[in-house]
Regions:
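A short glycine-/small-residue-rich loop at the edge of a beta-strand within enzyme catalytic domains
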Residues: 8, 57, 129
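Amphipathic alpha-helical protein-protein interaction surfaces
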Residues: 23-26, 62, 102, 123, ...
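Short Pro/Gly-enriched beta-strand edge/turn motifs at strand-loop
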Residues: 20-23, 49-53, 75-80
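A conserved amphipathic terminal alpha-helix motif
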Residues: 114-154
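Hydrophobic ligand-binding cavity/cleft-lining segments
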Residues: 1-48, 102, 154
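Hydrophobic-ligand binding "helix-grip"
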Residues: 28-29, 36-43, 56-107, 111-113, ...
């Protein structure tokens, strides 16, 4: 089992960060290892959207597909994802964005375990690096979107 939690203050608003993480259809464009993503179902109830998504991940010769239930809560600025089917015993992630005067405080947590011991051992070797690369990719995507929108306003 592997888990990680981190908290960062970023110069982007909570709604800007939420928009980047909630835009799961774009993950193949910028999330390391995301080789494809397909929306299987989408439902909305007020400001809460629930998406069932199938993601293909690729790391070297390893390719796996898994299905998750993703909950987007716009009122609370929270994105939760829970594993439904695939190679994991469990996989849970949570992004929470708290407004701050000069941006937002971003809380990220991931907890997972593979069913297969070989996959578990391999993931343990690269887990910290992959988490850093993934969170860095979301921050870079926010910077890209924020800078583009800032220049368009000038």
């Amino acid at each position: 089992m592997s888990s990680h939690e981190e908290k960062r203050v970023l110069p982007f608003s909570a709604s800007e960060m939420f928009a980047v993480v909630a835009d799961i259809e774009k993950y193949p464009e910028f999330v390391p290892g995301c080789a494809g993503l397909r929306i299987l179902d989408r439902k909305s109830a007020g400001n809460v959207e629930t998406i069932i998504a199938e993601m293909m991940v690729s790391f070297g010769a390893l390719r796996e597909t898994y299905t998750s239930k993703v909950t987007l809560d716009r009122n609370k600025n929270i994105v939760d994802a829970h594993h439904i089917d695939g190679p994991f015993d469990h996989l849970d992630t949570r992004w929470c964005f708290v407004p701050r005067d000069s941006g937002s405080e971003v809380h990220f947590a991931i907890d997972f375990a593979f069913r297969n011991r070989l996959l578990a051992a391999a993931s343990n070797l690269v887990f910290d690096r992959m988490v850093r690369k993934t969170t860095g990719a979301f921050i870079a995507r926010a910077a890209q979107r924020h800078n583009a929108s800032h220049h368009a306003q000038q």
